[in-house]
């Protein structure tokens, strides 16, 4: 995207700004490259975009999640583990990995290594943990185990409802 900061503020960022004013809980950051803002990194890896613009200028204090790190914009240009570390240091709270167990493992290993080595500071990690826990608390999300679901029972109930609203064969 070839927009400068003025164009972004007056056009592309308007929906984000409005969502933030209306207490959006989370924002997903895309892997788009904003050449005139940060010519080196896509938005999902850019401290300029996430911390300076989204958090400081737009005053967003909710959860920032990356787009899927297994997308070509990342995997064709970066090591997925290094990209995850960069995303967290840029200000993302959650790194999304949608495809491949090995990808998820690599990201987790690299993030763990980065925290242990100090590449990701404890302070930075605490900020993300706080925002995520605050969001979980707001929606009363817990880590309690959910009982297994009886699919047969659910299908029975669905069929009962559908049958109540179905026309008899001769009327159809």
Segments from the language model and where they lie:
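Hydrophobic faces of well-ordered beta-strands that scaffold small-molecule active sites
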Residues: 27-29, 62-66, 95-96, 132
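Short acidic, glycine-rich surface-loop motifs adjacent to enzyme active sites
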Residues: 20-41
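Glycine-rich tight-turn/loop motif centered on a GG-T
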Residues: 1-10, 37-44, 114-121
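Alpha-helix-loop-beta-strand connector modules within alpha/beta enzyme cores
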Residues: 11, 43-65
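Short coil/turn connectors at secondary-structure junctions
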Residues: 22-25, 59-61, 90-93
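Preference for extracellular/luminal or secreted protein segments
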Residues: 56-57, 75-172
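Active-site-proximal loop/turn and secondary-structure-junction residues that shape catalytic pockets
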Residues: 31-35, 70, 101
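Phosphate/pyrophosphate-binding betaalpha-module
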Residues: 4-26
């Amino acid at each position: 995207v070839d927009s400068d900061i003025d164009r972004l503020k007056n056009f592309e960022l308007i929906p984000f700004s409005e969502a933030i004013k209306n207490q959006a809980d989370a924002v997903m950051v895309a892997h788009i490259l904003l050449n005139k803002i940060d010519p080196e990194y896509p938005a999902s890896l850019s401290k300029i975009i996430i911390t300076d613009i989204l958090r400081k200028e737009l005053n967003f204090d909710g959860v920032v999640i990356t787009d899927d790190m297994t997308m070509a914009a990342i995997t064709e240009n970066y090591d997925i583990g290094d990209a995850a570390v960069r995303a967290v240091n840029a200000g993302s709270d959650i790194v999304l990995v949608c495809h491949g167990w090995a990808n998820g493992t690599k990201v987790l290993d690299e993030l763990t290594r980065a925290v242990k080595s100090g590449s990701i500071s404890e302070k930075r990690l605490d900020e993300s943990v706080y925002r995520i826990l605050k969001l979980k608390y707001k929606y009363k999300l817990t880590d309690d185990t959910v009982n297994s679901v009886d699919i047969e029972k659910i299908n029975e109930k669905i069929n009962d409802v559908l049958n109540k609203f179905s026309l008899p064969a001769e009327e159809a």
